[in-house]
Amino acid sequence: MANYGTKIDEKWQKFWDENEVYKFNPENSGKKLYTLEMFSYPSGAQLHAGHWFNYGPTDSWARLKRMQGYNVFQPMGFDAFGLPAENYAIKTGIHPQDSTLKNIETMEKQLKSMGAMFNWENEVVTCLPDYYKWTQWLFLKLYEKGLAYRKKAPVNWCPSCNTVLANEQVVDGVCERCSTEVTKKDLTQWFFKITEYGDELLDKLDGLDWPEKTKSMQKHWIGRSYGAEVTFKVKDSDLKFDVFTTRVDTLNGVTYVVLAPENKLVDELTIPEYKAAVEEYKEAAAKQSEIERQSVSKEKTGVFTGSYAINPINGKVVPIWISDYVLATYGTGCVMAVPAHDERDFAFATKFNLPIERVITDKENTNPDLPYCEYGVLVNSGKFDGLTTDEAKKKIVEELEKDELGAMKKNFRLRDWLVSRQRYWGAPIPVIYCDDCGIVPVPEKDLPVKLPYNVEFTPDGKSPLGKCEDFVNTTCPHCGKPAKREADTLDTFVCSSFYYLRYVDNKNDDAPFDSEKVNKMLPVDKYVGGPEHACMHLLYARFITKALRDMGYLNFDEPFLSLTHQGLILGPDGLKMSKSKGNTISPDDYIKEYGADVFRMYLMFGFGYTEGGAWSDDGIKSVGKFVDRIERILENCRNIINSNESTKDSIDSAEKELNFWKHNTIKGVTEDGDKMQFNTAIARLMELTNALNKYTQENIKNANFLKETIVDFIKLLAPFAPHFAEEQWSLLGNNSTIFNEKWPEFNPAALVKDEVEIAIQINGKIKAKIMVASNLDEEGIKAASLENETIKENTEGKTIVKVIVIKGRLVNIVVK
């Protein structure tokens, strides 16, 4: 009867806690290893299998590294502000603060029942004043450096969540949280100037040990391009506007220009005759998402403003249109249209019967079909005819620069980070508005600006804090006159943009962190979390790290040196888990039945860690049986060790065979575990389990050698089944934790066998197997094979045509 279960888990969790086994000591001599899992949102009542898949296997990796001599720092906390927690509170009718703190309490218990070696003394909870004081401090520091600013801008608005969304929170035109179609709305908002770091955010990516797909996503999101900014003057007007283009070589082919419907110039450019049509078009465009507007398959629409622009390179007059395929948020919000050499412009010109003029041909001058979008040679471009695209770009910009009508320009797809939210459950923005003094940052000594409890937070499109008179009404820190507080709260991603720094010095009341401590502990060596954060949290954290570095607080460039994305655990039906589908997996139920280590090992053995897959009850049952089998075999081994019967001191073939499997397993588990290939690491342990079981069947056994083997076996097992391994370790008579033991090292010599098994085939069919010396040459192997009695019988009376030897594996005898 197996003994392992939750009682064993509880026993060793108590031992670890009472003996402070995992308490981090920064003075330890071991090489530091900052291991971090993305902290959890406490928006639901409990942890699910996905949390476990993030935290459990990563903890096993950290345990392995600890036993290899690393001084592991593995803190845990909660990303407690934001829409998920607020929506949960609205759904349940419980105040966000009460529901969030209760959920955290539950999740803490669940995380502790996992048996992970989290450094709970370094815990952070972002919704507590002792944390968001430093979120507000960060805002003030960015404001001081000109990296936080306020402006009126068209923003993404979710009518269901009743709040603004950052560009990164809009997926395929809908809100990533509730899937409601996102619209545009003009609001005065706070932004962080992440674009200031566009070049470095892009250039430093290649040096990071991150998944290539994630790096590619960030590169695309940042979207650096090189081109020219060209100034078009409006005919019969003092107005002018700039366009950004990567194909200034086609400037002579411009036959019209297009402005985004939201462009501020549109109202000034539109003549009365076209006013009604333009206004109607603007309203329709505002209801569409940017994704929809940029769709290649979408039919092109637009309206003429009645005004004309002057092409700065040739003086030609071209009409000014507005169209929704031009976005106010990209470039200048104005596009020079060259229909002969751009597919979207070509479709637009074809529909509205606008001129199409070729200005680029191929090098053979064959006049390829239009639109021709490749590089080539200029035609119909006056003095620039005959130049290649690259030559023309340089010459045309030089010509424009003479009249101050153009210049080389670098552009980014990346937009500044919108951080204002019209919701309650977030860190208040530490700003005061005074009629006399304008925008006044809250003095640092007055932080934190506390979030009031008694607030009506049901979303109605307005900031809930604006309805709380006690909060909003204050006095100006400069002049002492009545003033108003900012009623918006900060995007929760601001809280998570620096939490990895606060962990190191979480009890510091005077600063967000001690720079000396942080610079010693950071960057994070291994970061684990979902790939959905590629263009949000992971990008924002990089920006904040660089900004704090430039302020003198940090001496490193990047927050996370190595990044791993865990896969997704699906329901038993192969679909994403959700309560509505009834396919969710509750870890608590399985832990009660099997124990935390079986649950952990199933997650590591049943799935590739970066891939995930569908949950299987049969799978966890199999792992449970495997642990039971280990328990029986180890008990048998202990009985053999403690018995004086049928033992020996010599190392013979059976011991050499077991020693081979031991060192083969040490090598495999070390290599696979280090690469987070947990499923193959556990498969290696299964091989050693089989070898151990086989050895116990020997008539005479070497008890001392057997003990050495199971000592190493339990050490290898420990990261993957920590409670179970501690119990087995103690049953060997040890009083200290196994996690203070040194990780086994493999001996290459042990992997060289004295003898190897050779399969002998006759005409491709195996007829016998023999053991030969591992260093035997081909002639010796051939001779030994032909001397085998079974082979003699099968070749008698036949002609041996040839004998093929594959050393160390097989012999094939061809007969006729």
From Swiss-Prot:
Subcellular location: Cytoplasm
Catalytic activity: tRNA(Leu) + L-leucine + ATP = L-leucyl-tRNA(Leu) + AMP + diphosphate
GO biological process: one example: leucyl-tRNA aminoacylation
A Pfam family that the UniProt record links to this protein: Anticodon_1
InterPro entries given in the database record: Leu-tRNA-ligase, Leu_tRNA-synth_edit, M/V/L/I-tRNA-synth_anticd-bd, Methionyl/Leucyl_tRNA_Synth, Rossmann-like_a/b/a_fold, tRNAsynth_Ia_anticodon-bd, Val/Leu/Ile-tRNA-synth_edit
One annotated Gene Ontology cellular component of this protein: cytosol
Enzyme superclass (EC): ligase
Listed GO MF terms: aminoacyl-tRNA deacylase activity; ATP binding; leucine-tRNA ligase activity
Residues annotated as binding ATP: K579
NCBIfam families noted in UniProt: leuS_bact (TIGR00396)
Record-stated family: Belongs to the class-I aminoacyl-tRNA synthetase family.
Protein name in the entry: Leucine--tRNA ligase
